[in-house]
Amino acid sequence: MMNYKEAREYIEQRPRYGGELGLDAIRILLEELDHPERSLSFIHIAGTNGKGSVLSHISTVLTYGGYRVGRYLSPTLYSYRERFQVNGSYISREDFVRLVCVLKEGVERMEAKGIQAPTPFELETVLCFLYFREQQCDYVVLECGLGGLHDATNVIPMENKKLAVLTSVSLDHTEYLGDTLEKITLQKAGIIGPGVPMVSAPQKEEVKKTLESYCKSHGFQWKAADLSEAEVISATLEKQCFRYDGQEFTIQLAGTAQIENAVTAYEALQMLIKHGLDLETSQIVEGMKKTQWNGRFTKISEHPIMIVDGAHNPDAAMKLRSSIEQYFAGRRLIYINGMFSDKDYETVARITAPLAEQIFTIAAPDNDRALPPERLADTIRQYNAHVTPCATIREAVCAAKQAAGDDGVILTFGSLSFIGELTAIAAEEESA
């Protein structure tokens, strides 16, 4: 029997990219393991931004409504095991190790037949099916890793898919999904199928037209959330209140994008009710009040105020800028910024950098896609001369706190990958 470290290494050391584009390897492994996915009911989420927030709202409400709910998500903030949850509790190390041993046996049978083994994400996806079947989940809410059509999560049989949800779509991962909004939308829409209702977040006009055409040509049922119908009552860093569809909502998630995510989740749950889910609208309102989702315009420190946000592409950067202007107009802003090299960091810098008084750049830890802080700083200098590369996250936090003083606001963004470490450092500093 492996230990936890060995089980993690077994998954992480598999080849990261399959051979031919497609889902053959994961389908063969599922066949080897008696198709655990066929015993489950899924709510499948694709999109560029907002997947995690919508997932969190839907799963929290379903749990509040008395259902046993599996969550499968990535990336994680605090623990690798965070990606496999039942009613908000992470998978245990013991269950993880035991199920990796099951995966390993299936992979070895594949390899003995000369069949290429699945990638790490495909293995994790199969593990989530095994775990949630064991846990007898009523619903599994899961988000795509990349795109939709060819994503490992799209092995779910359409008859097991109770709802498809499309969150905000914008340009990202263009080397894999296509270089236009139309191409990316069609990739994301690949999770929709016959008999599967779909709910979309409010979308850009080009995305909306592509979706309308795609769904009409295939005869798919869908509905879009309407952000213009949402009336914001109040917004602070602790909570936001708004009216929508005759209901008054309070959510704990700050930031202008979170109203959009909340109404998308609401419409998704209403669609499930329409198709037989036993849930009251009052339970949606109460459940959404309980939803927590860190790393999305989240305050992690009070003195000085420190906000963390996962914004890592131009669309998310525009929403981040909107939140900055709403919450911190006229305040001194200090940034800590780290990006991956395969992101459009130049456009993100153009959108965000002019608002800052000082910027400290960092590298995402333990990731070969991390953009060196010096290179990011060189790019940012086109839009703001006051930028300093830092060797470590701790160095950046200390420098940013000194620059912020008593009245400045520190804003950290660019990737979810370093938020866990940064949050821990900020908590240490706050209690020191």
Model-derived segments and spans:
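Short functional linear segments
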Residues: M1-G47, S53-Y67, R71-L73, E108-Q116
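ATP-dependent carboxylate-amine ligase catalytic core
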Residues: L30-E31, H35-R38, Y64-E159, E205-E206
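Beta-strand->loop->alpha-helix junctions that form or flank phosphate-binding loops
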Residues: L73, A201-P202, Y214-T236, Q252-T256, ...
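Acidic, Mg2+-coordinating active-site environments of NTP-dependent enzymes
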Residues: M110-E111, Q135-E143, N160-E248, A262, ...
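Short, high-confidence coil segments that cap the C-terminus of an alpha-helix
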Residues: Q136-D138, G330, G405-D407
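Nucleotide phosphate-binding/pyrophosphate-handling subdomain across enzymes
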Residues: Y139-C144, D151-V165, S170-H173, K183, ...
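C-terminal helical cap/extension that packs against the catalytic core
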Residues: K204-K223, T236-E238, I305-M306, P314, ...
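Active-site-proximal loop/hinge segments that shape catalytic or ion-binding/gating pockets
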Residues: S415
